[in-house]
């Protein structure tokens, strides 16, 4: 069984810029952790993001040139601080659109409710191989602002899609969806920063990190921006940036 392929990126190559997959770990760190620090070093960021020092240096060079971070000192004694978090976030939003960057498949399901679907994932040992995304992640964090009853899932391994289709009794759907499967662009962020969300006493699933959920929703056509703004006005991690970005 094959799902309905929604849209794909126009290029198979990873963009070689600060918004690429691995580089995004640094942006995530800056906007969530670095924003709380008076100063930090490139070596510190590279270590915490598990990236090579060379990649971190290239990303910081670009961030400095664009004025997002401020640098003090020389050579190995350089220290940085995040100078323009709101501008960095806005530029990231301008350069990332989940619909353009990710492959998506839309389905209807024979199951009657979300709990049955989540329990089926757990029963088939798939709960650590999918990640709640978009509106599903917003709901899991307790910040749902729509009446949508859809499920959006990142799939960490593309070869698992057919198994998920089979176990969840999925049928392709051309317009709208009950379930949306997504092959992620920002795999590095998901692997490093996804959080465990307790949906009920028996259901515990991984959720897309709050910042990535916001980025994903902002340009998502199905009531995404509305949901993103609702979250940004209420979640402290986002409020620090968003209040200056609107």
Language model segments and positions:
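Short acidic, hydrophobic short linear motifs in intrinsically disordered regions
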Residues: 36-49
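Short helix-to-turn junction characteristic of helix-turn-helix DNA-binding domains
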Residues: 30-34
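Long, low-complexity, charge-rich intrinsically disordered regions
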Residues: 1-2, 97-246
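Glycine-centered, phosphate/nucleic-acid-interacting loop/turn motifs that mediate DNA/RNA or nucleotide
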Residues: 66-68
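Short, Lys/Arg-rich nucleic-acid/phosphate-binding segment
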Residues: 72-95
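Alpha-helical DNA-recognition elements
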Residues: 62
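Short alpha-helical segments that sit at the start of domains
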Residues: 3-28
């Amino acid at each position: 069984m094959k799902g309905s392929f929604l849209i794909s990126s126009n290029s198979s190559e990873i963009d070689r810029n600060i918004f690429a997959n691995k580089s995004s770990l640094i942006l995530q760190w800056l906007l969530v952790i670095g924003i709380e620090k008076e100063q930090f070093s490139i070596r510190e960021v590279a270590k915490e993001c598990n990236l090579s020092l060379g990649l971190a240096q290239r990303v910081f060079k670009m961030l400095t040139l664009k004025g997002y971070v401020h640098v003090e000192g020389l050579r190995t004694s350089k220290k940085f601080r995040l100078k323009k978090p709101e501008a960095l976030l806005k530029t990231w939003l301008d350069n990332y659109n989940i619909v353009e960057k990710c492959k998506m498949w839309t389905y209807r399901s024979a199951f009657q409710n979300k709990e049955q679907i989540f329990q089926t994932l757990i029963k088939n040992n798939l709960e650590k191989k999918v990640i709640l995304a978009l509106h599903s992640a917003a709901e899991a964090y307790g910040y749902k602002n729509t009446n949508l009853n859809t499920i959006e899932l990142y799939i960490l391994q593309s070869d698992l899609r057919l198994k998920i289709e089979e176990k969840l009794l999925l049928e392709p759907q051309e317009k709208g969806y009950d379930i949306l499967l997504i092959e992620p662009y920002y795999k590095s962020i998901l692997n490093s920063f996804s959080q465990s969300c307790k949906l009920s006493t028996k259901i515990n699933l991984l959720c897309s990190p709050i910042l990535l959920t916001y980025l994903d929703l902002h340009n998502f056509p199905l009531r995404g921006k509305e949901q993103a703004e609702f979250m940004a006005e209420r979640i402290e991690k986002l409020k620090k940036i968003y209040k200056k970005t609107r």
